[in-house]
């Protein structure tokens, strides 16, 4: 019986501590700039645009626009 009460109290305390720390950290990120630059560099490396004069189509993206199969 004592062990059960101790376990219940311990679980309640741990739950309360998690809820308190979750409310305190809402809306804050420690390393916001690291995450945003990592995400940006990853997306830039997969979607680079092609320069003027290079061939373009459905799978390639031009920096300007695609006109008659060539980037302008």
Curated annotation (Swiss-Prot):
It comes from the Eukaryota. One of its GO terms (cellular component) is host cell presynaptic membrane. Belongs to the conotoxin O1 superfamily. Residues 23-48 form a propeptide. The modification Threonine amide is found at residue 72. This is Omega-conotoxin SVIA. It is found in: Secreted. Changing residue 51 to P: In SVIA-1, SVIA-2 and SVIA-5. Omega-conotoxins act at presynaptic membranes, they bind and block voltage-gated calcium channels (Cav). In vivo, this toxin is a potent paralytic toxic in lower vertebrate species, but it is much less effective in mammals. GO terms for molecular function: calcium channel regulator activity; ion channel inhibitor activity; toxin activity. Keywords: Amidation, Calcium channel impairing toxin, Disulfide bond, Hydroxylation, Ion channel impairing toxin, Knottin, Neurotoxin, Presynaptic neurotoxin, Secreted, Signal, Toxin, Voltage-gated calcium channel impairing toxin.
């Amino acid at each position: 019986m004592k062990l059960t009460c101790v376990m219940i109290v311990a679980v309640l305390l741990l739950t309360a501590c998690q809820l308190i720390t979750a409310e305190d950290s809402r809306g804050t990120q420690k390393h916001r700039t690291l995450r945003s630059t990592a995400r940006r560099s990853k997306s830039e490396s997969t979607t680079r645009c092609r320069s003027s004069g290079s061939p373009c189509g459905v799978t390639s993206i031009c920096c300007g626009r695609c006109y008659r199969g060539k980037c302008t």
